[in-house]
């Protein structure tokens, strides 16, 4: 299977807008800060950040979980992926993803180390999205 065929899973009807589902637990980086950073990255790439997801469409999923070791160090787990989100009863959410569309890290360190890993993983997933949905040479959506 070639790369183009596998990337069809992450293609969107309207690739110029994307929802980012962001979940942060007990970390030195807040949901609000991470959301602002991700939305700024999207806007720089001319992608409109959506405030609501359309179930069944590709979204950028970011989950960052931390446990404080002391006042300046955390153990962290980061998962960033292109995923299809499906809302179930109440607040339940099902997340479908493919392994090759997942980026992330496990580690222990300060806020700066966590931020570096978040930036790297978000950039990797976002580039995969752009490559699947746009012809990056002329800057137009794929036909």
PLM segments and residue spans:
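Short acidic low-complexity segments
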Residues: 47-58
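A structural "domain/chain start" motif
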Residues: 1-36, 131-143
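Alpha-helix initiation/capping motif
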Residues: 30, 51, 107-110
């Amino acid at each position: 299977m070639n790369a183009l065929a596998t990337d069809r899973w992450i293609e969107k009807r309207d690739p110029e807008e994307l929802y980012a589902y962001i979940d942060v637990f007990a970390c030195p980086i807040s949901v609000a800060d991470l959301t602002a950073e991700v939305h700024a990255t999207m806007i720089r790439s001319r992608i409109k950040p959506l405030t609501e997801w359309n179930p069944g469409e590709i979204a950028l999923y970011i989950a960052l979980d931390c446990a404080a070791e002391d006042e300046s160090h955390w153990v962290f787990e980061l998962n960033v992926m292109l995923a299809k989100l499906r809302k179930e009863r109440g607040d339940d959410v099902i997340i479908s993803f493919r392994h090759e569309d997942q980026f992330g890290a496990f580690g222990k360190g300060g806020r700066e180390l966590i931020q570096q890993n978040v930036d790297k993983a978000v950039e990797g997933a976002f580039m995969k999205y752009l490559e699947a949905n746009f012809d990056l040479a002329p800057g137009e959506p794929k036909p």
